[in-house]
Amino acid sequence: MSAQDSIPYLQIRVDGICQVTPTHFTKTIQFRDINYQLSDNEDKQAIFDGWCDFLNYFDSSIKFQFSFVNLTALRESFARAIPLRSDQFESIQRELSKIIEVQQAKGNNGIVKTKYLTFGIDADNIRSAKPRLERIETDILNNFKRLGVSAEVLNGQERGPAPHAPSPPAAKPEPFTFRWEDLPRSGLSTKDYIAPSSFLFSRAKDFRMGKKFASVSFLQILAPELSDRILKDFLDIESNIVVNIHVQSVDQVSAIKTIKRTITDLDKSKIEEQKKAVRAGYDMDIIPSDLATYGAEAKKLLSDLQSRNQRMFLVTFLILNTADNKRQLDNNVFQTNSIAQKYNCQLTQLDYQQEEGMVSSLPLGLNQIEIQRGLTSSGVAIFVPFTTQELFQDSPEALYYGINAL
């Protein structure tokens, strides 16, 4: 079995459509940041409400995945970005290069942050999948535009580095080199460019990816309420980290029926407890506290779905940590778990499911971890993917160098 076999998709097409299984097809959109954390409360609420509406677009036929990839940039990549030229601005260019080197040694340690949204549908073949994927793509881009978010769809050439993203720190320090026209005459597939040199899944809670150590954990959402800073705090960790949120919308009618059945079952249990109380000779209003709590929460959830424009979603929250050695990996996982505990959640390393976790951490729209938490639209939206807009100029005519406020 080769490293390529651990990356389970069938093909990536030139237009960016990935055939993950014979009947499941996905596309990926890369989106940018907007100002959220620096905004006042009124603007934050407007962005949050808009993000809830964004999530409500996805019905039960569309599976989608948010991927937040933080990887340390190589020093050589900065050098290639600003090649020295012998002209009248050479001294200024050297000064700029020195500033970048100094900032790379501190601050965010040269971490490059990218955000992806991968969405997928089931279809009999690519012919029937393509027009529907294109309609969904147009709707998503328009919804991003309403939020003021810049976004673009990745084609096959651009999408190659997306699943490749966890691999460079693991095994491939060289830049990603891939040209579509090379495939026919080389006899290679896109997996040969994406896969690291090797995978080793012999341990229960971590694995090897090339020369690097890695571990996938899932977030147990135990808190009754979460802060909108939890995702930001995870992504502020100054190490290689990939956060993935897999989301599946539940059919609205089915969700309401399920909750109504739950309320009926809780009411039956309440009546049984009251009968026991009468037979025992004590106040029938005294019922187990858990029963009262669950009943109130179920009724509130039903009200949210019926009257507050909320949908029901099933969410899987995964975090992939990578490091140069086992000790550093353990420290990174410990630091990530500390943030989870800060918000009354628990981060648990997957036990003998590291390969499935690795696959689910690739932006392919494929979730192989069946650990899900039901959340409403506002519950999913609390993982706000925005902090502050990047002031970044990568053109040859860039005019200034600066540091973001956050």
Language-model regions, residue ranges each:
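Active-site-adjacent "gating/activation" loops or surface patches in catalytic cores
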Residues: 23, 383-406
